[in-house]
């Protein structure tokens, strides 16, 4: 599947659509990490890794046009993720705090995060559990991946 951890966390994915597949290769990478990985793959620093994997060592693998294109679910013309979701830098910072660091909403608000945004992200995270339960298995690369080690009530309020 094409989903990443940010999308799986907040349910920004379609059951039997982009969630359909046998393996969620980037399912444990936040969207900002996917962006960084794509930038790195196109950098000179990745040349040795690309060579070891038998990939082209010259030119771009991902490409500037793809890396700079605004993220979109592409379900309607001119749709962008930012129409429905917070900026991924802000979203991923909150998701990391809530998921990996197990911080509470009040703790995040006390640390200076926007209360409305914290409440919204917490609500999205809870309400998306039913989708995560139906997601393809993912490649675990973080200490706290979705799957058997992460469970919320499936019918969140």
Give the location of each predicted region:
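ATP/NTP-dependent adenylation/nucleotidyl-transfer catalytic domains that generate, transfer
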Residues: 1-157
